[in-house]
């Protein structure tokens, strides 16, 4: 593949943008090499500035569940733009969006729109602290909830790639209010709540970890956390920025049958546009300003164009059989990847929940953060580049989940597996 134009753009970007990018994982630091620059996207494909086409399993990090540039979403955006870009005042779309979310996710009796997943999680923990009168927050090793100071403590995703336990600039006093548990460890969670349960305002978790690759919860684990939070008066917060409306229509909470107190959502509710939301029980959400004393605001919250895009996408995912079909395709992809790896003599295991999957270069079943970090990362990096050169784009980090969309049809999956058969041989080194 020719990458001359991408190389030229990256050289320019490095003079003006820190690391040449606006989000660290895009820089390919983990896998080596340089990123390609996208010119357009359509369906299951990205097209770069050099004219190369890639099957996309990143999906803008999850939200493009109906594929890129879907005609219905595109038409909704065009119609909304004709009426204006931003009002700074209420619009009908945000009411319809709230009605849609509360109908599809019953634990969310009320919702507040924001502008990103990070903003949603920051607002949710502020609400948890304000509602309980407590200060401590519990999170999990390998889970990532955005770049808020309270979360950059043994964080996953980009922070895990950089190999540092926290970020400079986070006050020690604030980080001390964040308690970190090993994911999928029943005993550790019980012990922590027995010791400090009276000080814990809330526990925030990715119900399926998507930022240390894809790690599903052990059977009964989420139920265990729900019981601990209820017993000790802490709020259970599900970060469904990745899993919401993807692993099931009602998100991971519907898939696993758990009712959290608060839920955060990200750009999937904006059809991929910059947007987020948080919601929960009415008595909690009524404490948010102006109804209550806990302050949170946003000039662009409920943006009319983002609401139109999100509503169009959420209409599509409600079609009968949508999620079952995606789950079946994901299962077929994962089985094919494991078979191709076995044929090449490469130790690989996969995980999946709905249309979200993980690929680990290990023979072990991965259920913990420690197991994820112990995988053969150099082998993944070789595999990544071998796939990329054949026109298949995986997340440029061994610590990120993969995502399918309804545009990933049988032909796309077969093309992916054909590339994988070649790439696994390259991964052996």
From Swiss-Prot:
UniProt superkingdom: Bacteria
Catalytic activity entry: (S)-4-amino-5-oxopentanoate = 5-aminolevulinate
GO cellular component, one term: cytoplasm
Pathway: Porphyrin-containing compound metabolism; protoporphyrin-IX biosynthesis; 5-aminolevulinate from L-glutamyl-tRNA(Glu): step 2/2
Keyword Cytoplasm in annotation: yes
Alphabetized SUPFAM superfamilies for the sequence: PLP-dependent transferases
Modified residues (N6-(pyridoxal phosphate)lysine): 267
Disulphide-bridged cysteine pairs: none
Record localization: Cytoplasm
Alphabetized NCBIfam families for the sequence: hemL, PRK00062.1
UniProt similarity note: Belongs to the class-III pyridoxal-phosphate-dependent aminotransferase family. HemL subfamily.
Protein name per Swiss-Prot or TrEMBL: Glutamate-1-semialdehyde 2,1-aminomutase
């Amino acid at each position: 593949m020719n990458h001359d134009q991408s190389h030229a753009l990256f050289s320019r970007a490095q003079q003006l943008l820190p690391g040449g990018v606006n989000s660290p994982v895009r820089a390919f630091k983990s896998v080596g090499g340089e990123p390609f620059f996208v010119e357009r996207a359509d369906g299951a494909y990205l097209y770069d500035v050099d004219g190369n086409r890639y099957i996309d399993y990143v999906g803008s990090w999850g939200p493009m569940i109906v594929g890129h540039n879907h005609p219905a979403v595109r038409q909704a955006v065009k119609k909304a733009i004709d009426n204006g870009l931003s009002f700074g005042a209420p619009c009908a779309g945000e009411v319809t969006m709230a009605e849609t979310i509360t109908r599809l996710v019953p634990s969310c009796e009320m919702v507040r729109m924001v502008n990103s997943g990070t903003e949603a999680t920051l607002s949710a923990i502020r609400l948890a602290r304000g509602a309980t009168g407590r200060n401590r927050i519990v999170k999990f090793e390998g889970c990532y909830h955005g770049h808020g100071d309270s979360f950059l403590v043994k964080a996953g995703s980009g922070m895990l790639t950089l190999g540092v336990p926290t970020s400079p600039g986070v006050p020690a006093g604030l980080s001390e209010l964040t308690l970190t548990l090993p994911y999928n460890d029943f005993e550790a969670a019980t012990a922590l709540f027995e010791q400090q349960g009276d000080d814990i305002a809330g526990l925030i978790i990715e119900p399926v970890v998507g930022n240390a690759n894809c790690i599903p919860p052990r059977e009964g684990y989420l139920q265990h956390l729900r019981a601990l939070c209820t017993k000790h008066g802490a709020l259970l917060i599900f970060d469904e920025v990745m899993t919401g409306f993807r692993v099931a229509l009602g998100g991971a909470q519907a898939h696993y049958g758990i009712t959290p107190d608060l839920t955060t959502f990200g750009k999937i509710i904006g059809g991929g546009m910059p947007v987020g939301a948080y919601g929960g029980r009415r008595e909690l959400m009524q404490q948010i300003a102006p109804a209550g004393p806990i302050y949170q605001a946003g000039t662009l919250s409920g943006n009319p164009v983002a609401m139109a895009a999100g509503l169009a996408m959420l209409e599509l995912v409600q079609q009968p059989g949508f999620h079952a079909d995606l789950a079946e395709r994901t299962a077929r992809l994962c089985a094919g990847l494991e078979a191709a790896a076995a044929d090449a003599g490469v130790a690989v295991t996969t995980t999946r929940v709905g249309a979200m999957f993980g690929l680990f270069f290990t023979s072990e079943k991965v259920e913990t953060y420690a197991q994820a970090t112990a995988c053969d990362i150099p082998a993944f990096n070789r595999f990544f580049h071998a796939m990329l050169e054949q026109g298949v784009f995986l997340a440029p980090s061994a610590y990120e989940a993969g995502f399918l969309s309804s545009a990933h049809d049988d032909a796309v999956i077969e093309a992916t597996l054909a590339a994988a058969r070649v790439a696994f041989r390259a991964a052996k080194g």
